[in-house]
Amino acid sequence: MRVGIPTEIKVQEFRVGITPAGVHALKEAGHTVLVQKGAGLGSMITDEEYVAAGAQMVATAKECWDCDMVVKVKEPLAPEYDLFHEGLILYTYLHLAPEPALTKALLEKKVIGIAYETVQFDNGFLPLLAPMSEVAGRMATQVGAQMLTKIEGGMGLLMGGTAGVQAAHVVILGAGTVGLSAAKVAMGMGARVTILDSNLFRLRQIDDLFGGRIQTLASNAFNIAAATKDADLLVGSVLIPGALTPKLVTEAMVKTMKPGSAIVDVAIDQGGCIEPTAKHGATYHDKPTFKYPVNGGEVVCYSVGNMPGAVARTSTFTLTNATMPYMVDLANKGWKKACQDDKALARGINTYDGKVYFKGVSDALGYELHCTCDILK
């Protein structure tokens, strides 16, 4: 199989879809790997390293997109839609629920869209989303701490406080991988932490893990409103795999926040879980924040849709450690046999032959839902 690795074109996206180790694994299995020149530079991977691993370096993205399978990090953007072709296996984060134009293009070109974020084990674990969720969660607290400084428009709080001065209060919506990672960093910085989730079993796990040092609350409108009002930093980390994120924090709730407090909406790539950030839309690393007016001042809001791209080298190697085994399987067996042999990978199928195969996308965009059982017989 011919596997193409184009350069990511999203604004300030520095990750790349494959490492030299991935190239080597595909090459050893008898496949051809085409990497666009310079694709790895944002992750500090040189063209020479790819060549040494067995890749062919090509000048244009089109040469990569003309392959049997394209491996990326972020969802394709409009300039790439014309490069789709029927039967192409596209293996990347897709986040289709809030992307009607991309979904339409994939269906029209009959692309086999396998989304990292919906590959799922029977127990609900998301093996290809978890690596970047861990990075984004850790970043959320670091970014939030900076936003609370006066020079960034915050109220001038030090996350951990000092002797005799109260620490900042970090409120985290969602106790999944993002939320847990954000909580670990916040606790390490000395903050007071509250985490909300609808899964009481998960909250018990969090309580045990941190020895009761984190306040855990059942996620309901009353508790969310109260916690939001008291938050110095609000982190949105709610996830329904592959579906639009529910807007759990309303504009009215945000209006009760203290002037100079901060919001980080990690869920923005699935539509956002906090109304002001969801309405504003994704921001970019070169201008990551915007101000939202509240009584007597403003809240600093951060809604970058590709947070891990800022720490590209860590993110690229973390992600490809997880994606590589499935990538090699797809190349060795073909997409259909690979998905027949692995139920988790089969759940990653979002589009095939002009049809939608993932419920979250179907529900969000109004397409008829088809069952992978019909194509994986």
Swiss-Prot record:
Gene3D superfamilies hit by this protein: NAD(P)-binding Rossmann-like Domain
Name of one Pfam family that matches: AlaDh_PNT_N
Keywords: NAD, Nucleotide-binding, Oxidoreductase
Catalytic activity, reaction form: L-alanine + NAD(+) + H2O = pyruvate + NH4(+) + NADH + H(+)
GO cellular component terms, A-Z: plasma membrane
Domain of life assignment: Bacteria
Biological processes annotated in GO: alkanesulfonate catabolic process; L-alanine catabolic process
Pathway: Organosulfur degradation; alkanesulfonate degradation
MF term (GO), any: nucleotide binding
Amino-acid positions noted as binding substrate in the UniProt annotation, renumbered to this chain: 15, 74
Function statement: Involved in an anaerobic respiration pathway that converts the sulfonate taurine (2-aminoethanesulfonate) to ammonia, acetate and sulfide. Catalyzes the oxidative deamination of alanine which regenerates pyruvate, the amino group acceptor for the taurine--pyruvate aminotransferase enzyme, and liberates ammonia. Can also catalyze the reverse reaction in vitro. Cannot use NADP(H)(+) as a substrate. To a lesser extent, is also able to deaminate L-2-aminobutyrate in vitro, and in the amination reaction the enzyme can utilize oxaloacetate and 2-oxobutyrate in addition to pyruvate.
Self-association and partners: Homohexamer.
Name the UniProt record assigns to this protein: Alanine dehydrogenase
Source organism of this protein record: Bilophila wadsworthia
Gene symbol of the encoding locus: ald
